[in-house]
């Protein structure tokens, strides 16, 4: 995930790479 979602999913605490 090389988009704005990349760091966001770590901030949410849910590393979703579906």
UniProtKB/Swiss-Prot annotation:
Q: Which protein, by its recorded name, is this?
A: Melanotropin beta
Cysteine pairings via disulfide bonds: none
**What the protein does?**
MSH (melanocyte-stimulating hormone) increases the pigmentation of skin by increasing melanin production in melanocytes.
Name its cellular compartments.
Secreted
Tell me, what is one Gene Ontology molecular-function annotation carried by this entry? hormone activity
Q: Would the keyword tRNA-binding be found if you checked this record's keyword annotation?
A: no
Per UniProt, the keywords (alphabetical) are: Hormone, Secreted
User: Its GO CC terms?
Assistant: extracellular region
Q: Which family does it belong to?
A: Belongs to the POMC family.
Q: Which domain of life is it from?
A: Eukaryota
**What InterPro entries does the entry give?**
Mcrtin_ACTH_cent (IPR013531)
* Chief site of localization: secreted
Residue ranges of the TM segments: none
Q: Which organism is it from?
A: Equus caballus (Horse)
């Amino acid at each position: 995930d090389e988009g704005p979602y990349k760091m966001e999913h770590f901030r949410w605490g849910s590393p979703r790479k579906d």
